[in-house]
Amino acid sequence: MSNSKSSKKPVVVYGASGYTGRLVCEYLREYNIPFVAAGRNVNKLESAMKSNVAGIETASYEVVEVLHTTEALTHLFKGASVVLNTVGPFAKFGTEVVEACLAAKCHYTDTTGEQDWLITLDQEYGARFAAAGLLLSPGLAQMYTTGEIAAQLCLDTPGLDTLDIAVFWGGSPTIA
């Protein structure tokens, strides 16, 4: 446990003890990508890794407890290439993570489905990330991925000029 050391692993999964964070850690382990499993509670992180990430004993990873402040996150992110933020609601908890990524000079991704957060990132951070040569890629959640892939296929296929996509989801809305 530490919030005083910089990352020497290429990927930081912030919010690694949550459902999506654990899935990401499992994926990174499968591809032998070293990572830092970071979050606010070292005990929850360690338990989540040991209990919910199949084969975690074969992974090159660290568990790091960190305060949710721009300063602490910046220090943790230094040395990493990319941060995957799974801590939501993103409109409430995302700003510190994005600011820390800029300060630490690492790419930012998240799993948001919050339209207001996507707009905020584009308007307030898009140009700053671009000027720094950094990727700002929110909304990597499945609900957007299908449409993005279909749109790219359309762009790459001569003769296609129209794309109709319909996505139907069940369940109830999330409340932040």
In which residue ranges do the predicted regions lie?
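Residues in the short beta-alpha loop(s) of Rossmann-like NAD(P)-binding domains
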Residues: 17, 40-42
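NAD(P)H-binding glycine-rich loop region in Rossmannoid oxidoreductase-like domains
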Residues: 34, 43-120
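Rossmann-fold NAD(P)-binding glycine/threonine-rich loop
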Residues: 112-134
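Conserved anion/nucleotide-ligand pocket segment
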Residues: 141-143, 147-176
